[in-house]
A protein has these predicted regions:
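Hydrophobic positions on the alpha1 helix immediately C-terminal to the Walker A/P-loop
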Residues: 18
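Conserved lysine of the Walker
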Residues: 15
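Conserved nucleotide-sensing/catalytic segment adjacent to the nucleotide-binding pocket
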Residues: 48-97
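Hydrophobic anchor at the beta1->P-loop junction of P-loop NTPases
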Residues: 7
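Pre-Walker A (Motif I) flank of P-loop NTPase domains
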Residues: 1-4
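Conserved substrate/cofactor phosphate-moiety recognition/catalytic segment
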Residues: 23-65
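A glycine- and Lys/Arg-enriched "phosphate-lid" helix/loop adjacent to the NTP-binding pocket
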Residues: 92-171, 176, 196
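Walker A (P-loop) phosphate-binding loop of P-loop NTPases
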Residues: 12
Length: 205
């Protein structure tokens, strides 16, 4: 089974760009690494805004399928995690009075989240440092995105999950992660760049 690396943060915090950079930096070290971008982005693009908590089941299953497709690699990088649908489900409901069905769905998602947490070897949180620009897919504005950031952190802390906050430019963030993974040795540069990484990501997705 691969070492699983999850890069987490709210919408438009730079996590997808970071996994592209990290993927490149690991490939040029001749590491057997696979990457998958979050399933929910494709879901939102194809089906529109999520309106019901039950849709988080589909997000969970889609993300699980993506992550299982990386089992052949030594390292598996994602910018999401299968426990995040629970966080979003809880966030969607907010403080409103919950129906019996909503409570049961939230319980199911929580059980799945707790079951899946141990499979991640490294969890990194990416704080919002570069401002917020809408991408035409996600519905959240910056204020909501910041609230999602807090919801993710609250979950990690409430469940005593070990995670590392990664700051700096995209390149600096990637280098810090490599150091934590003990992969920061000097290497001979190869002709691989972020454009190539983006093409590989498109092929894999």
């Amino acid at each position: 089974m691969p070492k699983r690396i999850a890069i987490l943060g709210g919408p438009r915090c730079g996590k997808t760009t970071l996994i592209q950079q990290l993927y490149v930096d690991m490939k040029i070290r001749d590491l057997n690494v696979g990457v998958a971008t979050e399933y929910s982005t494709d879901y939102l693009r194809d089906k529109g805004m999520i309106e019901n908590i039950s849709e988080q089941y589909g997000i969970y299953l889609g993300q699980l399928h993506l992550e299982e497709s990386l089992n052949e690699f030594d390292y598996a990088i994602t910018d999401y995690a299968t426990f995040v649908p629970y966080i979003y489900g809880r966030f969607m409901l907010g403080d409103k009075k919950r129906t019996t069905k909503e409570i049961e769905i939230l319980k199911d998602l929580y059980i799945l989240a707790l079951r899946d947490l141990p499979k991640y070897d490294h969890i990194f949180f990416v704080p919002r440092e570069f401002g917020y620009t809408k991408d035409g897919v996600r519905w959240q504005d910056e204020e909501v995105a910041q609230a999602v950031d807090k919801a993710i952190l609250s979950f990690l802390e409430a469940e005593n999950v070990r995670y590392t906050t990664i700051t700096g430019s995209t390149k600096e963030r990637s280098e810090k992660i490599l150091q934590i993974l003990n992969l920061s040795k000097e290497i001979e540069p190869k002709d691989i760049n972020l454009d190539m990484a983006t093409k590989w990501l498109r092929i894999k997705n």
